[in-house]
Each structure stands twice: as structure tokens, then as C-alpha cells.
Amino acid sequence: LAGFFPHLEALKKEREFVLCGDINIAHQQIDLKNWRSNQKNSGFLPEERAWMTRLLHAGTEGAGLVDVYRKLQPDTTDSAYTWWSNRGQAYANNVGWRLDYHLATPAIAALARTEEIYKTIKFSDHAPITVDYDFTL
């Protein structure tokens, strides 16, 4: 994972960008339903969370990206989940994790206006997240 940072730094020197998709890491305790019991599980391991923190940290040690969903919804928990295990009744009981992200350079993140985690139709164990940005192409 550490090898990804030089690529992001080079990209930031060229242009603004959005990195979005399934990162497979729940960054903070509010990003999953049962954080206490998942501290030793992949997706919430300390080293994974540290990598994510570094991804969001500005300065020489980090990539300085912005978690756009958290910018728009800083305290949201249960409605923020984008993944549910296929075991048990995880989806029905909303025992989920927030593993999917829109990460953006600060200039683009500042243009984010609204977000939506689409749960109307279940396509897979993940729900897509969309963000509306205030700019035209």
C-alpha cells in the first residue's frame, strides 16, 4: 500500500482528481456497526486504518486527500454503510461497514454539494455512493 503514495503525489502535481471505489477499509469507529468486535479483522486492522489516515493527511507524510462523504456527513453512522456481509441478516439488520469512498483533492472536495448511498436496489454486497460536485465539464 505504501507504494501507492508516490503515484498519488505525482498525480496531484499534474491535476486535481477524485479517487473513488471500494477501499475495503473502515477508517474510523463510526464507519462500522460493531467496531469493538472487529478490531482484529481485515478492513479494520490498525495498520489499515493508519494507511487510510495517511491517505487523508496533508503534508510530506500523506497524500492530503479529502474523504468527501465525511466532509458532507461528518457524524453519520448507520446510514453511511456501503457494505454488508452475506452472512446472517447483516443487510436486513443494517450491520454494515463503510468501505466505499469518494476521495478528492482539496480543490475538488470543496465543490462537493450532496451525496447519496444508493440502497433502493441491491446490486451486490456493496452499495454505490454518488457525490454531486458543483462544476461543469
Where in this protein do the model-derived segments appear?
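Short acidic, gly/pro-rich beta-turn/loop elements at beta-sheet edges
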Residues: 31, 113, 125
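Active-site beta-strand termini and strand-to-loop segments that position acidic
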Residues: 94, 105-106, 131-136
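A residue-level signal for conserved active-site and pocket-lining positions in enzyme catalytic cores
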Residues: 22, 68, 103, 126, ...
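Pocket-edge structural micro-motifs
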Residues: 85, 101, 105-106, 119
